[in-house]
């Protein structure tokens, strides 16, 4: 029997970016099965996503915030092999794929933008 984990996908807005911009998660909670690829999406409202750098972070139960990905294929230590970030300019959307989720990937995921 496969264990089901739950990844919570929330948006985070960084200071220094105009207040008219909003990052909106596609879903607040994304159910994920161990080993089955999962996709998190975050859209930008109020501005073109191509004008900003998009970053993804994970917060674990211990409240540790860890950098996962920044646009232009920059990954945090240990994330490059199992995570894939992308920007869909046409849809004004940031995408983070977890290629083979495991129990250690459980947590709250945040998308953020900066210039």
Swiss-Prot record:
Gene Ontology biological process: adaptive immune response; innate immune response
Keyword Magnesium: no
Gene Ontology cellular-component terms listed: T cell receptor complex
Covalent S-S links between cysteines: 42-111
Top-rank taxon: Eukaryota
Keywords, comma-separated and alphabetical: Adaptive immunity, Cell membrane, Disulfide bond, Immunity, Immunoglobulin domain, Innate immunity, Membrane, Receptor, Signal, T cell receptor
Predominant localisation class: membrane
The keyword Signal is annotated on this UniProt entry: yes
Location(s) in or outside the cell: Cell membrane
Xref: SMART domains: IGv (SM00406)
Record-annotated Ig-like domain positions: 25-115
Signal peptide boundaries: 1-19
Function: V region of the variable domain of T cell receptor (TR) delta chain that participates in the antigen recognition. Gamma-delta TRs recognize a variety of self and foreign non-peptide antigens frequently expressed at the epithelial boundaries between the host and external environment, including endogenous lipids presented by MH-like protein CD1D and phosphoantigens presented by butyrophilin-like molecule BTN3A1. Upon antigen recognition induces rapid, innate-like immune responses involved in pathogen clearance and tissue repair.
Subunit structure comment from the entry: Gamma-delta TR is a heterodimer composed of a gamma and delta chain; disulfide-linked. The gamma-delta TR is associated with the transmembrane signaling CD3 coreceptor proteins following the stoichiometry: a single gamma-delta TR heterodimer associates with one CD3D-CD3E heterodimer, one CD3G-CD3E heterodimer and one CD247 homodimer forming a stable octameric structure. Upon activation, gamma-delta TR complex associates with FCER1G to initiate intracellular signaling.
Alphabetical list of PANTHER family matching this protein: T CELL RECEPTOR GAMMA VARIABLE 9, T-CELL RECEPTOR GAMMA CHAIN
Protein name per the record: T cell receptor delta variable 2
Organism: Homo sapiens
Species classification: Eukaryota, Metazoa, Chordata, Craniata, Vertebrata
Gene: TRDV2
